[in-house]
Regions:
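Alpha-helical transmembrane segments of multi-pass membrane transport proteins
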Residues: 1-204
């Protein structure tokens, strides 16, 4: 309540949103990158509820004003804020994990970012493909979700350089492009992406 009151009475939320829109030059991709960066910083060291309230009042309005669906905008900033738990320099989850595995916290944080890199891409696809959030018919949602699983698993294989065996550089590039295409909203891109991934697997 205090946070919302301060943001509302001072006009901070409107100013912050206007700042993001003006800096981005009304370019949605740039606005998304700036919003994610802001959400990562604002979410550092905060519990889930507090982080969401803060980013929902400061950063989400900028995306909504640029035509992004309300649910997608809020999920984008919420998801981004939660990723701050593994993002250096704060990375509270990494500090907890470091105490368990007895490793330097920053090393654990960097490895966490490497393993969880796909998670930093997912919020963008919430905006590009709102059906990932269940905004559509059951058939559409199931189909899009299945495609998302294929895309995320493929990206994870690319980042690790391993699928059913060690991947070559060319295989990683082809699978990576295919995985990104699968996550796109256009059906043609999805089909091209699946074809690219299958081509690599068949040629294995």
């Amino acid at each position: 309540g205090i946070i919302i009151g301060v943001v509302t009475l001072t006009g901070m939320g409107l100013k912050f949103s206007s700042f993001i829109v003006s800096i981005s030059g009304n370019n949605l991709l740039v606005a998304l990158v700036l919003t994610m960066a802001s959400s990562l910083v604002l979410g550092m060291g905060l519990p889930t509820a507090a982080a969401y309230i803060l980013v929902a009042t400061l950063t989400a309005p900028a995306l909504v004003s640029m035509g992004v669906d309300l649910m997608a905008a809020h999920m984008f900033v919420f998801y981004s804020a939660m990723l701050s738990s593994i993002t250096p320099p704060v990375a509270l989850a990494a500090f907890a994990a470091a105490a368990i595995c007895r490793e330097p916290p920053m090393r654990v944080a960097m490895i966490s970012v490497k393993f969880g890199f796909v998670a930093f891409l997912l919020p963008y696809f919430f905006v590009l493909e709102p059906r990932l959030l269940g905004m559509g018919g059951i058939g559409e949602t199931v189909g899009v979700f299945a495609m998302a699983v294929v895309g995320v698993l493929s990206l994870a294989c690319v980042l690790q350089g391993y699928a059913f065996g060690k991947l070559t550089t060319l295989s990683r590039i082809v699978i990576g492009i295919g995985a990104l295409a699968v996550l796109m909203p256009d059906l043609k891109f999805k089909l091209i992406g699946i074809a690219a991934i299958l081509a690599v697997l068949v040629a294995w």
